[in-house]
Amino acid sequence: MTIKLHDLRPAPGSKTPRTRVGRGEGSKGKTAGRGTKGTKARKQVPTTFEGGQMPIHMRLPKLKGFRNRFRTEYEIVNVGDIARLFPEGGTVGVDELVAKGAVRKNSLVKVLGDGKLTVKVDITAHKFSGSAREQITAAGGSVTEL
């Protein structure tokens, strides 16, 4: 005989009805699982209450200031990083920086002037700092903003 889906039944005793407490002396009435006397037997205690100890939400400092939701975040690449990643120079764009692992793809790139640049590099990025512009042009390269 094969078992069919409509023949399946839960094991006896596995499905018992939910016990409704506090509904008469005969069935978990009277204290209804709350024990005897005390605050927790008589009313609900707030979840933040820690027995008189200063609660954690009052011990921690308040959050101050605010975070601008419309701020544009740039991935930062320093001139020194470009000199290290491209020692022979040439043209460097966002795609080349992504390929070398300097920045993540689909991100805005800002070039900063930390480090030294000695080779001629033509860089294309979204933003440049003043010192980065100076170093790139001093080395004979060019700067192009997207």
Curated annotation (Swiss-Prot):
Name the UniProt record assigns to this protein: Large ribosomal subunit protein uL15
Primary role: Binds to the 23S rRNA.
InterPro entries, sorted: Ribosomal_uL15 (IPR030878), Ribosomal_uL15/eL18 (IPR021131), Ribosomal_uL15/eL18_sf (IPR036227), Ribosomal_uL15_bac-type (IPR005749), Ribosomal_uL15_CS (IPR001196)
Keyword Transcription: no
Keywords assigned: Ribonucleoprotein, Ribosomal protein, RNA-binding, rRNA-binding
GO cellular component term, pick one: cytosolic large ribosomal subunit
Record has Ribosomal protein as a keyword: yes
Biological source species: Mycobacterium ulcerans (strain Agy99)
One GO term (biological process): translation
Family, per entry: Belongs to the universal ribosomal protein uL15 family.
Region (Disordered): 1-54
